[in-house]
């Protein structure tokens, strides 16, 4: 199924709204929603990031175009999937897209995390894109929230 610009724009607009809502949730109390998050698998683990593939169980059903979502530094990758009502990854999946998320982890908990540079993040995004292309055989769309968008632009 070819991806039309209108479908992608609508899905990314919805995803942006969900991220804004998710940031508000974080601001007012965190991610404790007692709701199920979307299923994902960690398909790659690197010192700089983990690559999540959401709805991997559906991957054998000819998933749509891959969309790689990039969070900003210091914000949990869970911002893309706080709850079913505010889940960017669920909205993308419902639009027949194949959502992936780059998880940089918590710098204070990751080995060498506090020494990471902006360049390290940009290189990590580039590597994640290569991994998704290798896994799917398809070109990807990148979407980033705040500083994550800048990482996409620079990658």
What residues fall within each predicted segment?
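N-terminal targeting or regulatory segments adjacent to alpha/beta-hydrolase or S9 domains
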Residues: 1-34
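Generic signal for short, ordered secondary-structure residues
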Residues: 30-31, 70-71, 111
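Short, surface-exposed "cap/lid" segments of acyl-processing enzymes
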Residues: 36-108
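Glycine-rich adenosine-cofactor-binding loop
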Residues: 103, 132, 144
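Conserved acidic catalytic loop of the alpha/beta-hydrolase fold
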Residues: 107-112, 122-140, 153
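Flexible, glycine/proline-enriched loop segments at strand-loop-helix junctions
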Residues: 115-116, 142
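Short, hinge-like loop/turn segments at secondary-structure boundaries
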Residues: 117-121
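Gly/Ala-rich beta-loop-alpha elbow adjacent to hydrolase catalytic centers
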Residues: 143-152
């Amino acid at each position: 199924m070819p991806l039309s610009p209108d479908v992608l724009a609508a899905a990314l607009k919805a995803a942006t709204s969900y991220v804004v809502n998710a940031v508000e949730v974080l601001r007012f109390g965190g991610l404790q929603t007692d709701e199920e998050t979307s299923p994902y698998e960690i398909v790659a683990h690197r010192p700089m990031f983990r690559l999540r593939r959401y709805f991997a169980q559906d991957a054998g059903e000819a998933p749509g175009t891959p969309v790689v979502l990039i969070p900003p530094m210091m914000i949990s990758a869970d911002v893309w999937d706080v709850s079913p009502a505010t889940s960017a990854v669920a909205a993308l999946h419902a639009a027949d897209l194949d959502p992936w998320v780059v998880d940089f982890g918590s710098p204070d908990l990751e080995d060498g995390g506090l020494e990471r540079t902006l360049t390290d993040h940009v290189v990590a995004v580039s590597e994640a894109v290569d991994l998704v292309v290798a896994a799917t055989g398809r070109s990807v769309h990148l979407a980033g929230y705040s500083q994550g968008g800048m990482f996409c632009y620079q990658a």
